[in-house]
Amino acid sequence: MSEKEAGIEVQGTVEEALAGGMYRVKVDQGPVVLAYASGKMKKFHIRIIPGDRVKLELSPYDLSRGRITYRDK
């Protein structure tokens, strides 16, 4: 990925699991964003439930949406 397309890495807590594999995540220093699990997380059936700490990658173009890249233990 080029530097222009690189996402912004942030951490947060899952507040709510929505339909269609979407999640409402409260970012530590910011607002609540809408996020989805990355392809590898879906492939390996990693479960994400409300209360989990996660790492997000936010698009520099739309900071209200993101992709969950890691679930903390």
From Swiss-Prot:
UniProt xrefs under SUPFAM superfamilies: Nucleic acid-binding proteins
Domain called S1-like: residue spans: 1-73
Any Pfam family the entry gives: eIF-1a
Localization per record: Cytoplasm
Primary location class: cytoplasm
Disulfide bridge map: none
Family under the similarity heading: Belongs to the IF-1 family.
Self-association state and partner proteins as the record states: Component of the 30S ribosomal translation pre-initiation complex which assembles on the 30S ribosome in the order IF-2 and IF-3, IF-1 and N-formylmethionyl-tRNA(fMet); mRNA recruitment can occur at any time during PIC assembly.
Protein task: One of the essential components for the initiation of protein synthesis. Stabilizes the binding of IF-2 and IF-3 on the 30S subunit to which N-formylmethionyl-tRNA(fMet) subsequently binds. Helps modulate mRNA selection, yielding the 30S pre-initiation complex (PIC). Upon addition of the 50S ribosomal subunit IF-1, IF-2 and IF-3 are released leaving the mature 70S translation initiation complex.
Descriptive protein name: Translation initiation factor IF-1
Native source organism of the sequence: Anaeromyxobacter dehalogenans (strain 2CP-C)
